[in-house]
Amino acid sequence: MLKLLHASDIHIGAKFSSFGEKAATQRQALLDAFAKIIDLAISEQVQLLLIAGDLFDSNFPSYQSVSFVKDQLKKLDNAGIRAVILPGTHDCLSRDSIFKRENFTGFIFDNPEETQKELKRSPAIKSN
């Protein structure tokens, strides 16, 4: 039986423009939440982390946000846990998709066609 952890709508890099002085605190809370998801996946010894859309709030997150996510996904990979990431409405698959510009550890679904892949511990596998 497959043991998985599902997460979505994390929105790393959200601006929180209307939050005024509290915007930075909210942005940090998103990073902390993602780190807790990774830690939970490891402590619960899941086999797969499924991120079902909107890991990022846009296709243009900061370098620091991308670096943070890469570090967290690498931590997951080092624990032998696969990550499967589906782009969402905020970080959608377009020509300039963050998932096409950066190499993330895990499997990125970048093709709307039915795909069957064996997930192995390796850098991101493209579905096309």
Question: Which role fits each region the language model picked out?
Answer:
Residues M1-F68:
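N-terminal active-site segment of His-dependent metallophosphoesterases
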Residues L48, N59-N128:
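His/Asp/Glu-rich metal-coordinating catalytic cores
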